[in-house]
Structure formats: structure tokens, C-alpha cells
Amino acid sequence: DVATVFLVDLSASTSSPAVPPEPVVVEASSDPFDDPMSYGPIWDAPRTVEPIRRVIDVAKDAVALMGDALQDLGDRYAVYGFSGTGRDHVEFKIGKDFADRANASSWASIAEMKPLRYTRMGPAIRHASAKLQAVGAQTKLLIVISDGYPQDVDYGADRNDRDYGMHDTARALADAERVGIGTFCVTIDPAGHDYLRDMCPDGRYLVIDDVESLPEELAKLYLGNVGGP
């Protein structure tokens, strides 16, 4: 009997492209006026603009795929998003709660989650932990998906100061573990090792180099923590 929370970072930085666009290289020797077609009316050559796939889009797709799989397994799960601007404005968004059915309405709620403000992680972990504690499951797992370290306007005298946010988050994770909730932090930040090894319980984090591999890595992480084929 398993209950899992997927806690998704909704900080403003998750609006960044999942894969940075390739730079356009123009040869210095090329002269556009050598080709009369190159300076014709621009509407003569319509072009298709591909929508930019953002970090938040990959995260939402990953938890939606996991939701489908857990639904088939009969495992309970919830999807929440978090952000904030100071201690008086903590944002905790419900994509799917434990009591919600997995249907078009819950998928739409997850799809509507969008990048907001800062990465105020500690309070979100505490709130998600309280929701997990209320679920009568033998195994409880909290998976935090982020793209950077905890950060907010009042996390220390300088908003770039990492210490307060890291200590607050580490305390929230330790408190969750203390009441029997398995925690795991997943980040797509290449520098994630620098702070996650101090912030998370031993071995309870994963740094992903390729954001597009997030769905596959989440599946491996889940099976590794709850058991499976």
C-alpha cells in the first residue's frame, strides 16, 4: 500500500527552455544581396514556429505519465506545486489531491500549473508531509522536483544567500523522514550536487543532466523506493 506526493517547483525559472535553442551561425563571407530571393517580401516564405518546451512542461508531463502508471498499479498519489514571495505569501497549488479521481479535471488542473515566483521549498515540504501523514498507507513517499536551490526574498539578509533556505529545507526533509515519510529530491540543476548533498538525507537526491530524461528517471526512482519488477 503506497501513497506518493509529487511536489513540483513552480518558481519563475521553470519558464526557461528545457533545451536551450541552438545559436544561429551566419557565415561572415555571405552577402544576402548575392541572392535576389533573399531580399524578397518576407511573406513569400511562411515559416512554422515551434512552441518552446519549458522546464515546467517537462515536469508536468513527467508527473502525468507517473500518474497514469500509478493509477494502473492502484497506488495512491497527489500532485502539488509550490512557490512563494516571503513567509506571508507561500503558494501551494493542488494539481491532484489524494481524494481526487484521476480524470480530465485533474489532468487539466496539473496542466494549468505555471511558473510563479521564488523557490520557497521548506513550507511546501511541511504542508505536503502533513497531507501524506493523513493518508493511511504503509509506504509514504515525497518526491520534490525542482530546477534549483531554495530561494526567496526573506531567506537571509541577501536574497542570494543560500544558507537559510538550505537549512530550512533540510529541517523540513528531516522532519518528514522522522515520521516515516521517505523523501527524495530531484533536480535538473547541473550544480545540484553542491547543495543537495548537504540538504538531503544520505543518498536521497538525484541530479539529472538531461531534463528530457525526467520521466524515465522518475519511474526508476519510484520503483527503487517502493519495490517493483
Language-model regions, residue ranges each:
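Acidic, glycine-rich A-domain
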Residues: 1-229
